[in-house]
Amino acid sequence: VRKLETMQVKIGYPDEWPAARDMMQVTPISEGGSLLSNLLVSMQVSIEDSLSKLGTKVDRAEWDVTPQTINAMYDPLNNEIVFPAAILQAPFYDRNNSYGANMGGIGFVIAHEVSHAFDSTGALYDEYGNYNVWWTDKEMDEYKKMSQSIVDYYNNYEMMGVKVNGDLTLMENIADLGAMTCITSIIGDDAKALDEAFGQMTYNWASEDTASFMMYLLNTDTHSPNKIRVNAVLSSCDAFYRIYDIREGDGMYVAPENRVGIWK
């Protein structure tokens, strides 16, 4: 609870722009500049800015990403979640969307990032961002058992005949499962909102990849492939079975005792 209460939230863009921004001078082509030369200058400014902070107090208000970044993230060292301006738009958020659709869009993303505070890495950091195992031995043993069940669960999924690496994708799978538990708990028994949330969450991760790129992702990405990222989470979500009347023998059916999650 303390970790949640002290979690910092950054939305949109920083209140103050970093000093390094003023140090960066772009030289146009007309004056002899090039993409490479400007990139090298940018890297040098970044290095000098980082070195200048050695021995100084950490500025927790500083942003490590730009507002133009289409992503969201959790930083365990600062115990903060960050939502740049670029992700606060369709398909993740639309002010004209229904409550259910936005819950399945930006709601799922927010819950996913919060869940990272308690994934297999985030769980090792306390509310101040210190590497400090604050769980009791009993709690950690139980957590490891549940984590292993998630590893085993995802190991059973495959794409193009290749099994998902449940260990590689564990952190992201924990966050996805936690996010689904969170948004369905908030929505409750509203079948229409649940249907819209599931549909939007599915739409968010819809993609079409070449075979070679998919093989690359299977071997390197800490996220499960998008299709599995959706189907595996829904197949472990009790609300999914309830509103669509999923039964044994259906394609996405998983027996109740085999459904997984940390916060079920």
Specify the residue positions occupied by each region the protein language model found.
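Intrinsically disordered, low-complexity linker/terminal regions across diverse proteins
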Residues: 1-264
